[in-house]
Amino acid sequence: MFQSLIAIDYGKARIGISSGQMITKTATPIGTVEAYDGVPNWIELDKIIKCWNPSDIIIGLPLDTQNFETDITKSAKDFAKEVQQRYQRKVHLINEAYSTREARWRLEEVKSKKVSHIKVDALAACVILETWMSEN
């Protein structure tokens, strides 16, 4: 049984993070963790994982519109392996196609005054988590 969940929108400069639960099938943006060339600030990510203590971690897999791997797909897969080893949680990969576009659209719909990268990345993680929850 799933308890709390964390979703991650992997990126080379920032990693968006959201939390959610299967009971309500809702996701909430937590924020972002800075990354340097795809390597996250592990200390910050450690704090988030410790605080939320998720049963599972869902990571967006960057594929193109035809579900082919992109230049960043291998980095995301390597990151997912590191997350699984580091936190000893089940890690699920899900196609994240259009998650950033959907996040931007949602922010524009609520007329967010500042569509920042931080908001977009965290909200993209919500989109990833909501998609995964609807399929599981």
UniProtKB/Swiss-Prot annotation:
The keyword Nuclease applies. Keywords: Cytoplasm, Hydrolase, Nuclease, Ribosome biogenesis. GO terms for cellular component: cytosol. It is found in: Cytoplasm. One of its GO terms (molecular function) is nuclease activity. HAMAP family: Nuclease_YqgF (MF_00651). This is Putative pre-16S rRNA nuclease.
